[in-house]
From Swiss-Prot:
Family: Belongs to the SCC3 family.
InterPro entries the record matches: ARM-type_fold, Cohesin_Scc3/SA, SCC3_C, SCD, STAG
Cell compartments where the protein resides: Nucleus; Chromosome; Chromosome, Centromere
Pfam families (alphabetical): SCC3_C, SCD, STAG
Name of the protein: Cohesin subunit SCC3
Gene coding for it: IRR1
Top-level division of the source organism's lineage: Eukaryota
Other known facts: Present with 4090 molecules/cell in log phase SD medium.
Alphabetic keyword roster: Acetylation, Cell cycle, Cell division, Centromere, Chromosome, Chromosome partition, Coiled coil, Mitosis, Nucleus, Phosphoprotein
Composition skew (Basic residues), residue ranges: 1-12, 77-87
């Protein structure tokens, strides 16, 4: 094969200077024909857009599928083997394959351990390596952490003039040692640069025959942080060695020398020509590690050369030229000085020309090929060092010619390459923007060309890190005005991406980092738009009605852009309910808190003040209206007209943003909590007083904001006394409100959270207020039951009466009873059981679905569990409880027995009610609600019994006397029917054909859809957990258990674990089991039902029902109680029995 030697091209200076990129590329292509393997064709789209530039980048595009005989992973090897099959039929490939085996046969995985090879290969490798000794340079670089690289280089470079062949021999052997090659060259092998290709070819064959390889340089790079790694310093020392090599060579006058033909001409030194010749031959080798190390070495040379070129220009040529100019301006210039200055300038210019020539050759001989190498490591190194060259030498590299490579590699199929590119681009934009000496037209031109691709990567890339850094690129670009309004909306709307579920988003994961990055982008946009607005409204006053104009306008613009971004996000989405919109808006505000929380005082003042009469706001609104009348606004144009809380919708928007900003301050990484509480807490009561809190949409974000602050926060700023006024105001709203079912009424959850939060303050005066409300509610409830629900009076408004009963009394008592003890006298209990509970089967015919969903028996569970809790505390405190407590324990158990008996009767009566297609769902819901409460009470009683001291025989006897049975036989049958119903609904959802026993109802396969449950799987599994608890307590028999387990193989792994009693297993704490547990935890996170999946985070405004997940904590020890009661600790795990049982509306707590 005829080829033009690279050394010849380098020595021919006229060619180097005169030939353009295309001519040099064609010449290089002839020489590097063996590098066909390394080409990549990722940039076809870009090359089609610019055919002139495509000629530079496509010289190797036809070579992509050739053999690459170095380290490839298994997947790559398979892919390559598939690509090579058609080519193996060709004559050329066949001949090549006869000479040597294919790459899949002869190369190992990169730095793979020896046991990946056959015993024969290992023995052969050990035999070869037995007498092998690495070079002295390699030994020093790989083991010495404190070696003086400059001294080492100086001593070594001095040998070049004495013995050039030995010097090159040591240099090449150093590279080979770093690649793990046992082959080495002798001095006669490197005597002639003309034979460099042949020599490299022989080395390549020897390397392939070695079979086992260790790429020590790359291993050192990837393990540099590991302690006690034997070659830890190799990569760092090697990089410093090659970076300083030309610097020391320059000190020794080896970088450029005077020409032999013309003493005044400066030419490239022989050392550089030798190094470039051999390194360029290595860089087109088919061995990947050879290409990597030679490319890295050339790039490190270039790092120094770009610095030196600028150094010569700024520190020598500029100063010398200035001295020359000053000397020439003198009246009597000194001719000798002028001659000396001119001579020095000419010599320095000659040196810079040589350096520019070397830089140019490294680009042409290496970079333009290696930036699209088959190895993503080499492609990444190419982009990394190109950014260094642009930073060092912008006059040469900050051009479209080089910047386009970043745009092309945005489409790279390797995540690491795309990530490298997106990490570099923001710094390039910042560097260019801050530099006064360079023109930013190249950056602008390249950004405009690849802007669409950057946006696409930011929105759709499969790797979250790449998306994060792409948005950082757009953030810097937005500051320079490179983004249109429509493009700003595209990115800012990512704040509301439904993919980032609040259950998955936290301050410690990548999703959170993504939203934080978008928040930073949005904050930058808001600042830019504010500056733009102020420039166009210079006539605005500084202050109006006590409000500073600047912060008010900035807040208005922020709210407007945030609102427009949400609207844009929802434009192409399916219909989203209001709760989801609020959650998305609040979450966005949380992540914007670090940038916007300083404006919380302005937001509070706007919400407190009368915005309708504010002169400034009216003026801005009139200006906005005039602008909208004069111009047609595009839907995708970013409207920066400030938005203020002038109506109900905008007030709700402001309050939810206010809540998000307060919640975001709780992030410990932000450290704005102190400043936020000093702003918000003094104004909170005024805010609560000014707001229309009778509306749930306004009340919820306000109380959510209150919950984000602890008692210590109030005490630290001296506003603890405000808590009494806030509590009074909230209690009044609570008592005046009608509170419906928690699934449909947001007030249910927010009042429950507020009361729970105040309860944790442990302030007696505040707790007494809630206890007083319980007493008041009981009085009004008794009156309502006597007057409105008298069974002797025939009425036709049972539906409305039932809703009123729950909305005015039962739901409120249930909310209060979760934190404060509820005790009712026998009369009130009997009124509720007789006048309402026992009459439900009669009133049922007047109920619709919404009324049926309103009914629950949580208050009965609370009454029973608080009663048990009271006696448990007495038993714990009193030593001689057998004698000190009345022997007649009938009064203790009478109310609980009445509740259990009435719920049993209700369940049986509902089961006897005639089912129709219209009422089947509501009837099932009532039976399910009664059964779940009944099971909760039974488990609470059994826990109480199991926790009794061993000598409490009187208590145990009285319990057996008062509770001859817990569950009636007919009620047990109802439990089974409910299980079958839920099982059928879940099977229908997952499209599973169930097995059934002979006497089961065939209609269970055709049940209508029910809207009572948000998640059928959750309710089905939780009900199964309750049933398993009763089975462990021997309340349900084995026949029941066998039917529950009938379809355990078909209904998912979690159901099977519940049935098999393996869901709460705790493996031995050894390393192997810990790793297994982590794996299982990962699987559980992906499962449809998660133990915490129903617990709402602070991002949400509502909570889902979580009926009895904590029950599993209590049920598991029960099985062990027959052996050792001392191991039972369900009560101690919860403050009260109430907490252990009544979790049907459990509030998420920090």
């Amino acid at each position: 094969m005829t080829a033009v030697r690279r050394s010849t091209r380098i020595r021919t200076k006229s060619q180097v200077i005169e030939e353009d990129y295309d001519d040099e590329q064609n010449t290089s292509a002839q020489h590097v024909e063996s590098d066909k393997i390394t080409a990549k064709t990722q940039h076809e789209e870009e090359e089609e857009q610019d055919t002139g530039e495509s000629e530079e980048s496509s010289s190797e595009d036809d070579y992509e599928d050739q053999d690459d005989d170095d380290y490839v992973d298994t997947a790559t090897a398979k892919r390559k083997s598939r690509k090579r099959k058609p080519k193996s039929a060709s004559n050329t490939s066949s001949k090549r394959q006869k000479k040597k085996p294919t790459s899949a046969q002869k190369s190992a995985v990169s730095h793979a351990p020896a046991y990946h090879r056959s015993k024969k290969d290992q023995d052969q490798y050990l035999e070869i390596a037995k007498d092998f000794q690495p070079t002295e340079l390699f030994d020093i670089l790989s083991t010495s952490e404190d070696v003086s690289i400059e001294e080492l280089l100086r001593e070594w470079l001095e040998t070049y003039s004495e013995n050039r062949d030995k010097f090159l021999q040591e240099f090449i052997n150093l590279l080979l040692n770093c690649c793990g090659s046992v082959a080495r060259v002798e001095d006669h092998d490197v005597h002639s640069n003309e034979s460099s290709n042949e020599t490299i070819g022989e080395i390549q064959l020897l390397f392939q025959r070695q079979k086992l390889h260790e790429f020590y340089l790359l291993i050192s790079k990837e393990n540099k942080k590991r302690k006690n790694f034997k070659m830890g310093p190799l990569y760092q020392n090697f990089a410093e060695f090659m970076t300083k090599l030309l610097e020391v060579a320059n000190d020794l006058q080896l970088l450029y020398v005077e020409s032999d033909e013309d003493d005044t001409q400066i030419v490239t030194g022989n050392l550089v020509l030798d190094l470039l010749t051999w390194l360029s031959s290595f860089s087109v080798c088919k061995i990947r590690c050879f290409r990597y190390i030679s490319t890295l070495t050339l790039y490190l040379f270039q790092d120094y050369l770009t610095q030196q070129a600028v150094n010569l220009e700024k520190n020598y040529l500029a100063k010398l030229s200035k001295q020359l100019s000053l000397e020439e301006k003198k009246k009597r210039p000194n001719n000798k000085t002028l001659e000396k200055l001119e001579s020095t300038i000419a010599e320095t210019q000659g040196s810079k020309v040589v350096i520019d020539s070397i830089i140019d050759n490294i680009v042409k001989l290496c970079f333009v090929h290696r930036y699209k190498d088959v190895s993503d490591l080499i492609r990444s190194e190419s982009m990394l060092h190109l950014s260094i060259w642009i930073k060092n030498y912008p006059e040469y590299f900050l051009k479209v010619t080089f910047l386009k490579y970043f745009g092309w590699l945005l489409s790279d199929n390797s995540v690491s390459v795309r990530l490298q590119v997106t990490k570099i681009l923001p710094h390039l934009i910042i560097q260019n923007h801050n530099s006064k000496s360079t023109d930013n037209s190249a950056i602008r031109q390249v950004f405009e060309r690849f802007k669409t691709k950057i946006l696409e990567v930011a929105i759709r890339d499969v790797n979250l890190d790449v998306r994060i850094h792409s948005i950082q690129v757009l953030t810097e670009a937005s500051s320079l005005g490179y983004l249109d309004d429509s493009e700003i909306l595209i990115i800012s709307s990512l704040m509301f991406d439904e993919e980032f579920d609040p259950f998955k988003t936290s301050s410690f994961n990548k999703r959170s980092k993504f939203l934080s990055t978008v928040a930073k982008f949005l904050a930058r946009v808001i600042k830019e738009k504010f500056d733009e607005f102020i420039k166009t409204h210079e006539d605005l006053p500084k202050e109006v009605d006590g409000l500073e104009v600047g912060p008010v306008v900035q807040v208005g613009i922020f709210i407007k852009i945030l609102n427009d971004s949400l609207i844009y996000h929802l434009k192409d989405c399916a219909e989203v309910d209001s709760r989801t919109k609020i959650r998305m808006l609040t979450q966005a505000a949380e992540f914007l808190s670090p940038y916007i929380s300083t404006h919380l005082k302005t937001i509070c003042n706007l919400l407190i003040s009368d915005t309708e009469s504010n002169e400034l706001i009216q003026k801005l609104q009139n200006s906005a209206n005039n602008n909208s009348d004069d111009e047609d606004v595009d839907d995708e144009e970013l409207d920066i007209t400030p938005l203020f809380p002038i109506d109900r919708n905008s007030t709700i928007l402001y309050l939810n943003v206010f809540h998000g900003l307060c919640a975001g301050a709780n992030n410990p990484k932000i450290q704005t909590k102190d400043s936020v509480k000093e702003i918000v807490l003094p104004l909170f009561y005024d805010l609560l007083n000014a707001a229309s809190i009778e509306s749930a949409d306004i009340l919820c974000p306000l109380l959510e904001s209150f919950i984000t602050f602890s008692l210590d926060d109030w005490i630290s700023i001296g506003y603890e006394t405000e808590l009494k006024k806030i509590t009074d105001k909230t209690i009044k709203a609570f008592m005046d409100s009608t509170i419906g079912n928690s699934k449909v009424d947001m007030k249910y959850d927010i009042f429950a959270k507020f009361i729970h939060h105040i309860h944790h303050f442990e302030k007696k005066e505040l707790q007494e207020k809630f206890l007083n409300q319980i007493a008041t509610l009981k009085i009004h409830l008794k009156k309502f039951l006597q007057e409105k629900m008298d069974p002797n009076n025939s009425r036709d408004d049972y539906k409305d009466l039932t809703c009123s009963l729950y909305e005015l009394y039962i739901n409120k008592l249930t909310i209060l009873g979760r934190d404060y003890p509820i005790e009712v006298d026998e009369e009130l209990l009997q009124l509720f059981l007789n006048n309402f509970v026992s009459r439900i089967p009669i009133m049922f015919q007047d109920f619709d679905d919404s009324t049926a969903q309103e009914i629950n028996f949580k208050m009965l569970v609370l009454l029973a569990t608080w009663n048990l809790e009271k006696w448990r505390e007495i038993i714990e405190k009193v030593r001689d409880y057998e004698n000190s407590i009345s022997k007649d324990l009938r009064s203790v158990w009478k109310p609980i027995a009445a509740i259990i008996g009435r719920l049993n009767t209700l369940v049986i009566s509902l089961a006897a009610t005639n089912e129709t297609f219209e009422n089947i769902n509501s009837l099932f819901y009532l039976k399910w609600s009664a059964c779940t409460s009944l099971m909760d009470i039974i488990v609470a009683i059994k826990i109480f019994e199991l926790k009794l001291p061993a000598d409490a025989t009187t208590w145990r006897y009285s319990m057996s006397e008062q509770f001859p049975f817990y569950l009636h036989d007919n009620a047990s049958k109802v439990l089974l029917k409910i299980f079958l119903y839920l099982e059928s609904l879940f099977a229908k959802q997952v499209d599973v054909q169930l097995e059934r026993v002979a006497d089961e109802d065939a209609n269970l396969n055709d049940l209508p859809e029910t809207g009572f449950f948000e998640n059928i799987e959750t309710e089905f599994l939780l009900f199964t957990v309750k049933l398993k608890g009763l089975m462990k307590l021997n309340i349900l028999d084995e026949r029941f258990a066998s039917r529950v387990a009938l379809n355990k193989e078909k209904l998912g792994p979690l159901f099977k674990k519940i049935v098999d009693d393996t869901i709460m297993e705790n493996p031995e704490p050894n390393k192997k089991n810990i790793q297994k547990a982590k794996s299982n935890q990962t699987q559980r996170e992906k499962a449809p039902l998660q133990p915490n999946s129903e617990r709402e985070t602070d991002h949400a405004n509502t909570e889902n029902n979580d009926p009895d997940i904590p029950m599993t904590i209590d049920l598991e020890p029960i099985e062990e109680s027959s052996q050792n009661n001392s191991e039972l600790a369900p009560i101690e795990e919860h403050p009260t029995v109430v907490d252990a049982i009544d979790n049907s509306d459990e509030i998420t707590q920090d």
